[in-house]
Amino acid sequence: MNKERNPFKIVQAQFDHNAEVLGLDPALREFMRNAEREIIVRIPVDMDDGTTKTFTGFRVQHSSARGPAKGGIRFAEEETLDMVRGLAMMMTWKCAVVDIPLGGAKGG
């Protein structure tokens, strides 16, 4: 993946900018930049043509500080861990901004 287009790095940069504006404590800021938990699984699937293909799946729970981690799942062969990380982080902020008592997560 092109480093300049890394979705997780883009979301972290947006967070860093806003954390700077808000004057967040550096230790809290560093904690909030990364996920609480990441799960990577490899699942073998028997295909219709008789072959077996292995798929990699990701589940990222960015934060459960405000409640259970909420977030959907994306089914796409080109899904990446960094995309799922970025989307989970954004789900944390979306829930917090509208005062929904849930954390952020995503799967893919």
Give the ranges of each region predicted by the language model.
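N-terminal ligand-binding/catalytic initiation module
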Residues: 1-108
